[in-house]
């Protein structure tokens, strides 16, 4: 690798190569888990004792607790039990165009993206950091609309923006606006990809490919009715956990789509995964966009659709819950015993082919 190409941001093999190169420098057990959000605890495996607290206070390590105690808007649960496990996820958003339709823009996306990542490891999101990089010349009207979208989605998700930053760069040095958010949530029940094993059922929470297709429509000024699926997934995830469905792993199918998620799971678990083509719902509008531009819907990004592995005995309960939110949720496959790290796509006639991990320049700046 001599220089960075657009393909290095596409969610496929080139991106995995880049991540390995960069983050191997910071190698630790938490990073190695490769979940959507890092699962951490403060003060090690237990509560800080009095001497530890004194030492930590001198080193500034208790600033989080102290700041929360001084903030009268925080609930009591937010300032206790720093030895609990938490999930943290950060993401930067460079969506182009910054407005996809009347409902979805970079503001809504930046909240849903980070909040959903925290939800995917079984955490309840509580706090959000918010940082803007704004290009000189962005209209205040656009900025206000984006800010209102952020506020609306934070209220829906039940998260507070607790810190932030704003930078302005000269005209021509950016593309209207970039946003970074970091979500912070308390673990309800940890769901980690390292626990994927033979016999688990694979489900998807809805139809696939709509966000990527919506971006293509806007960039090419096409007449099409396809809308992004961008949404916060808190209701779906919390319903599954509240009903004690045995969810083993979850992943939102963003860059690289369904294909990227399944291939990552196959690689991490060392197991084959089979999925059934007729069980995966793809809307006709998305199929049309894929045919026009030569994409596979399995590789198109989603921003409000997630994939999950559950115990076989719980698959119908999981499906019933998910279909309350999206009738297109479905059971799409299972984890096999073969240790070859492949994703196998089987059609209605029994013919099979490998669903490869995405490669090359897919669709840059979709989130």
Predicted regions and their residues:
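Helix N-cap motif at beta-to-alpha junctions
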Residues: 310-315
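Extreme N-terminal starter segment of soluble prokaryotic enzymes
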Residues: 1-4
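Acidic, Ser/Thr/Pro-rich beta/coil linker or hinge segments at domain junctions
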Residues: 324-367
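Short, compositionally biased
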Residues: 214-229
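Short Gly/Ser/Thr- and Asp/Glu-enriched loop/turn motifs at secondary-structure junctions
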Residues: 34-35, 300-305
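Active-site-proximal betaalpha loop/short-helix elements
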Residues: 19, 28, 135-137, 226-302
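Charged/polar low-complexity intrinsically disordered segments
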Residues: 53, 58, 66-70, 76-77
């Amino acid at each position: 690798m001599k220089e960075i190409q657009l393909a290095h941001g596409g969610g496929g093999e080139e991106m995995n190569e880049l991540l390995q190169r960069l983050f191997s420098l910071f190698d630790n057990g938490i990073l190695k888990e490769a979940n959507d959000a890092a699962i951490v605890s403060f003060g090690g495996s237990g509560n800080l004792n009095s001497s530890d607290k004194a030492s930590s206070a001198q080193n500034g390590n208790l600033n989080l607790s102290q700041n929360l105690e001084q903030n009268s808007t925080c609930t009591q649960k937010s300032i206790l039990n720093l030895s609990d496990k938490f999930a943290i996820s950060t993401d930067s958003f460079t969506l182009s165009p910054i407005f996809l339709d009347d409902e979805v823009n970079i503001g809504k996306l930046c909240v849903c993206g980070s909040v959903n990542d925290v939800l995917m490891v079984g955490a309840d999101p509580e706090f959000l950091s918010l940082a803007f990089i704004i290009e000189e010349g962005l209209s205040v009207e656009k900025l206000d609309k984006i800010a209102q979208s952020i506020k609306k989605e934070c209220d829906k998700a039940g998260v507070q923006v607790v810190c932030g930053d704003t930078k302005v760069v000269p005209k021509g040095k950016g593309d209207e606006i970039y946003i970074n958010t970091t979500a912070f949530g308390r673990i309800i029940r940890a769901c980690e990809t390292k626990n994927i094993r033979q016999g688990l059922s694979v489900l998807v929470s809805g139809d696939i490919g709509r966000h990527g297709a919506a971006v293509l429509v806007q960039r090419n000024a096409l007449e099409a009715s396809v809308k992004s699926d961008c949404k916060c997934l808190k209701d779906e995830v919390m319903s599954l956990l509240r009903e004690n469905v045995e969810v083993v792993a979850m992943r939102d199918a963003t860059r690289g789509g369904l294909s990227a998620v399944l291939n990552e799971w196959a690689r991490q678990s060392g197991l084959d995964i089979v999925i059934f083509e007729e069980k995966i719902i793809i809307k006709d509008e998305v199929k049309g966009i894929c045919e026009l531009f030569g994409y596979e819907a399995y590789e198109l990004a989603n921003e409000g659709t997630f994939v999950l592995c559950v115990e076989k005995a719980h698959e119908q309960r999981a499906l019933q819950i998910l279909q309350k939110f999206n009738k297109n949720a479905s059971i799409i496959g299972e984890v096999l015993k073969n240790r070859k790290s492949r994703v196998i796509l089987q059609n209605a006639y029994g013919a099979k082919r490998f669903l490869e991990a995405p490669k090359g320049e897919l669709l840059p700046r979709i989130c």
